[in-house]
Amino acid sequence: MLLVDPALPMAPFAVALSGEFDCRYRAEPEEADRVVALVTASVPVGAREVAPFPGVRAVLTCSTGTDHLDLAELSRRGIAVASTPTYCSDEVADHALACVLAGWRGLWTLGADVRAGGWEPETVLRRFDAQRLGIIGLGRIGMRLARRARALGIDVVACDPVIAAGTEDIARVSLDELLSTSDAVSLHAPGTPGVPPLLGEAEIARMKRGAVLVNLARASLVDLDAVVAALDAGALSGAAFDVWTDEPPAADDPRLRTRGLLLTPHVGWSSPEADQAWRDEAIDGLRVALTTQPPSSAQPRRSADYAV
């Protein structure tokens, strides 16, 4: 039996695994011994979640990240872990570039000003090929973003302790240099529970004045209050987020009214192509996880490791 997170559609699993597994959203207590795999999207899975199912051999998360899984505990129990790390790399890179370009051209602040009755722009608009983009995390997504940006004549630098220097001739710089010299900073690093934000108040303060910050990765990577303070002070010209501390955010969250802040509803991954790709990748990953001996597990990667 395969237990699927109710937040996920059942059809991809029921159709692809018909005849192999009984796919359910829940199991009766007397059926617990039949469960061999758990499928989640963002629901945490650790000792408490797998304890009722002694026959579980694999956990699949339909996501690029695994920070909601207790990888150490699952490995200790001999439970294989699979994820869907590549299905939306192009979509997230596209979304990040769109945010960077919109920030440099002031699109969301100008639109708000016009709707409020304004017409004379107060925002400094920027020419793309005169800007520098700093990418934190040069894995699959970061590399795709770099290629797209360079095609527009944008100077690209990166900070990533995992990816070797010289990759595609993209300059590696320290985090301090990236923050202080980049006209936009885009984050593409994994989150790590219990670790301080990669960009805290001190790091935000070191960013180039008037820069744009883009975070499509994990809300925990950035001190949101420090970003809001920097926007209010004019230190940053814009910030775009596709992730938030609580999703969806409370309607009365005062940070949502911050000028220069763009928040999209965690849709950076989305496209018809990605919607099909995650299904294919999930089924393939689950089959591998269930048949690999000894079990293969995703390796935990700290936010300090960057590459995703």
Language-model-derived ranges and their functions:
Residues G210, L216-V308:
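Rossmann-like dinucleotide-binding domain for NAD(H)/NADP(H)
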Residues M1-A37, D305-V308:
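N-terminal glycine-/charge-rich "phosphate-binding" loop or analogous flexible N-terminal tail
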Residues V45-A47, P161-P254:
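Rossmann-like adenosine-cofactor binding region
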Residues P85-R132, R144-R147:
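Phosphate-binding beta-alpha-beta segment of Rossmann-like dinucleotide-binding domains, i.e.
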Residues P6, L138-G139:
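Glycine-rich Rossmann-fold phosphate-binding loop(s) that bind the pyrophosphate
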Residues L2-L3, L133-I135:
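Hydrophobic Val/Ile/Leu positions in short beta-strands of Rossmann-like dinucleotide-binding domains
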Residues A27, C62-S63, I79-D90, D160, ...:
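Short beta->alpha connector loops at strand-helix junctions that form conserved
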